[in-house]
């Protein structure tokens, strides 16, 4: 950001530069038993300008664990995702606190005539964390929504 605002939104100035990127992405999936599956994953990127300094809006280290159950017509899962603090920031960019998201869902599949329907309940951000996504242009003014719950039916015709 240039510290200049127009209609209450920050004005940005971009210029091209050579960068050095290092990172990793890993995923481990374990079918614990027939209905249960555990997934562990993580990713990280380190982005620096070739002449020194950090690239703006670089995502922080992220790690996640998901336990899923699927048997016959029933599916359920619970996922915890931890986003670490991002303090490797560019000039005029603010650091972002880390946060943990906890999401869960359960669904039941059934047939109605020739259509297959799925009834579900899902919850996102169950711990009602204040979430500011470091890669967002509006992170300092607009957090993600808090806890949400949804109940629905999805159909294939």
What are these regions (language model features)?
Residues 7, 11-89, 127:
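Gram-negative outer-membrane beta-barrel transporters
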Residues 87-88, 108-157:
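C-terminal beta-signal and adjacent terminal beta-strands/loops
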Residues 34-36, 61-63, 72-74, 100-102, ...:
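Outer-envelope beta-barrel architecture signal
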């Amino acid at each position: 950001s240039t510290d200049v605002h127009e209609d209450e939104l920050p004005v940005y100035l971009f210029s091209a530069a050579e960068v050095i990127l290092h990172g990793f992405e890993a995923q481990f999936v374990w079918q614990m038993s027939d209905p249960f599956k555990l997934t562990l994953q993580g990713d990280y990127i380190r982005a620096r300008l070739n002449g020194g300094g950090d690239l703006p809006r670089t995502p922080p280290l992220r790690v996640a664990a998901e336990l899923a159950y699927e048997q016959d017509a029933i599916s359920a899962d619970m996922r915890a995702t931890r986003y670490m603090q991002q303090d490797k920031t560019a000039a005029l960019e603010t650091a972002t606190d880390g946060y943990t998201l906890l999401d869960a869902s359960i669904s039941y599949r059934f047939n109605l005539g020739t259509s297959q329907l799925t009834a579900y309940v899902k919850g996102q951000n169950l711990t009602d964390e204040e979430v500011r996504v470091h890669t967002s242009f509006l992170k300092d003014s607009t957090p993600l929504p808090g806890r949400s719950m949804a109940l629905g039916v999805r159909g294939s015709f």
